[in-house]
Amino acid sequence: MAWTALLLSLLAHFTGSVASYELTQPLSVSVALGQTARITCGGNNIGSKNVHWYQQKPGQAPVLVIYRDSNRPSGIPERFSGSNSGNTATLTISRAQAGDEADYYCQVWDSSTAH
């Protein structure tokens, strides 16, 4: 049976010395195959911080898909893109494929507070 929709879940993680920094995100995002998925990660003035995105499939280690807001590591398809401004960082997956179904983690790195 062909996949008709993907369920993308999101977990958030903050790295830095300010443990009280809070991130908000949808528990899941559903998208039809071939359509565009947008997964958000919200935080106060998150646009001033570095956001990294990871994809994790069951039984596998996380894979970095976007680093420092909008950069793709080698081997990651151009369908994956990122943006970060104001209070929201967004991971965009264009032309969604069945293989994109996974957990997606946003990691926020605040270099101004890290030691």
Curated annotation (Swiss-Prot):
Bilayer-crossing regions: none
Region (Framework-3): 71-106
Ranges for region Complementarity-determining-3: 107-115
Region (Complementarity-determining-2): 68-70
Disulfide-linked positions: C41-C106
Matches recorded under InterPro entries: Ig-like_dom, Ig-like_dom_sf, Ig-like_fold, Ig_sub, Ig_V-set, IgV_Light_Chain
GO cellular component, one term: immunoglobulin complex
Protein name: Immunoglobulin lambda variable 3-9
Oligomeric and partner information: Immunoglobulins are composed of two identical heavy chains and two identical light chains; disulfide-linked.
Stretch forming the signal peptide: 1-20
SUPFAM superfamilies: Immunoglobulin
Region described as Framework-2: 51-67
Species per Swiss-Prot/TrEMBL record: Homo sapiens (Human)
